[in-house]
């Protein structure tokens, strides 16, 4: 394919990428809400405030990755994939413990993980791969 023509092909963002960005953002928002409720029940005072600050920093990093993915930065989707591949097996025992102590908490955690998996699958579809490979 001619490099001069390549940028015009598939220049608009594929629906799969748009949906992936939406699903990933939803997973972070759902996870943040769950975390705030957990922290509110377990902590108070300075420990609660400090935990909320760390949560906000974590969310900022997550949304930075999502915005970079939406901006067609291939490195962002690869880094996010690597983090998911590393994190998901490590989090699985926690999901089991959460399900035993609270079905609601465990279910929400699993829903967050499923949303992230769906988002990653959408980011690596054929149309998504082509979109990330084309030059801006």
What are these regions (language model features)?
Residues 1-136:
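Topology signature of small-to-medium multi-pass alpha-helical membrane proteins
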């Amino acid at each position: 394919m001619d490099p001069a023509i390549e940028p015009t092909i598939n220049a608009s963002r594929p629906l799969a990428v748009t949906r992936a960005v939406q699903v990933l953002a939803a997973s972070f928002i759902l996870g943040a809400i769950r975390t705030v409720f957990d922290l509110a029940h377990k902590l108070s005072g300075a420990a609660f405030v400090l935990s909320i600050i760390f949560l906000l920093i974590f969310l900022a990093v997550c949304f930075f990755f999502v915005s970079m993915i939406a901006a067609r930065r291939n490195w962002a989707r690869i880094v996010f994939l690597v983090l998911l591949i590393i994190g998901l097996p490590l989090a699985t025992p926690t999901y089991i413990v959460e399900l035993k102590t609270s079905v609601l908490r465990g279910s929400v955690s699993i829903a967050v993980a499923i949303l992230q998996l769906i988002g990653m699958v959408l980011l690596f579809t054929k149309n998504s791969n082509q979109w990330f490979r084309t030059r801006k």
